[in-house]
């Protein structure tokens, strides 16, 4: 099977030389053939390999955007990668034998932690009618639809298609379900991303080993003109008098120490 050979390539350094466009076309052709036999195990493996290739492509794109200082666009790609890994795990697929996927998952999380984003918009909506992408039936308890959103059937991931909804409100949150709806002043200005501005130029290629530790440091209160009832400059969302004013050390901020090869 072609897909088995592809996965063996992904598990080695040969993945750098893969023609992704050609491989995706061949995998889709092989999936169509296997669908006639409804071999769920093989179709799940093909879906996984297609998703793995998509993850690698997106990571290359993300790295390119970071180098171009397009940090917000790179952030959105990182979220797509994160969601793909969630989908893979939801289908009980183990990929610990594939170093490139292990690397990308690790560094996706590490890169996200370097962003200054703290507040996100979280819309609240009532889904009045949702239909299944596999069978087209309404997805409600006790319906005829037996499919589970997020699971793979015949090589395709099931998802709910929202046909009717009511918009309720928008909340400001620190732990969002959708990370792309970030609230950040002057979001396209690269100079607002100080940590990324420091480390990204030092990364010479997409796949090198680098690490960092985060410590809490403090700036003198005198660096800020702030009232007791103003929001604390540390970004906690709390009032100054209930936050850094209490520590008697200054305004807290994260200090990063990087280790590069």
How would you label these PLM feature ranges?
Residues 5-8, 12, 21-32, 76-79, ...:
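Polar/charged alpha-helical tracts
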Residues 91-202:
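Residue microenvironments linked to proteolytic maturation
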Residues 47-50, 69, 111, 115, ...:
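Conserved aromatic-histidine-acidic binding/catalytic patches
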Residues 57-113:
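Extracellular-facing segments of soluble proteins and assemblies that are Gly/Ser/Thr-biased and enriched
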Residues 63-65, 135, 148, 235-237, ...:
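General secretory precursor processing signal
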Residues 1-68, 73:
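Polar/acidic, low-complexity leader/linker segments enriched in S/T/G and N/D
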Residues 166-261:
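Acidic/negatively charged segments and metal-coordination signatures
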């Amino acid at each position: 099977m072609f897909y088995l050979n592809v996965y063996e390539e992904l598990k080695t350094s040969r993945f750098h030389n893969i023609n992704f466009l050609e491989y995706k076309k061949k995998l889709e052709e092989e999936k169509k053939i296997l669908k006639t036999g409804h071999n769920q195990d093989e179709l799940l493996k093909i879906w996984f390999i297609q998703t793995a290739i998509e993850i690698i492509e997106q990571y290359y794109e993300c790295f390119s955007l970071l180098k171009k200082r397009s940090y917000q666009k790179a952030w959105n790609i990182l979220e797509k990668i994160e969601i793909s890994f969630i989908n893979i795990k939801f289908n009980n697929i183990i990929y610990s034998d594939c170093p490139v996927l292990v690397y990308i998952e690790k560094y996706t999380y590490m890169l996200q932690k370097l962003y200054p984003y703290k507040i996100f918009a979280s819309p609240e909506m009532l889904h009045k009618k949702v239909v299944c992408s596999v069978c087209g039936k309404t997805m409600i308890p006790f319906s005829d639809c037996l499919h589970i959103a997020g699971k793979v059937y015949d090589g395709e991931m099931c998802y709910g298609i929202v046909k009717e909804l009511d918009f309720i409100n928008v909340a400001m949150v620190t732990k969002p379900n959708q990370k792309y709806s970030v609230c950040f002043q002057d979001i396209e200005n690269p100079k607002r991303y100080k940590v990324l501005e420091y480390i990204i130029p030092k990364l010479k290629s997409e796949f090198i080993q680098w690490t960092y530790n985060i410590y809490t440091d403090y700036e003198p209160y005198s660096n800020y003109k702030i009232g007791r009832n103003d929001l604390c400059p540390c970004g906690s969302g709390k009032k100054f008098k209930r936050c850094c004013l209490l520590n008697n050390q200054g305004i807290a901020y994260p200090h990063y120490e990087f280790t590069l090869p």
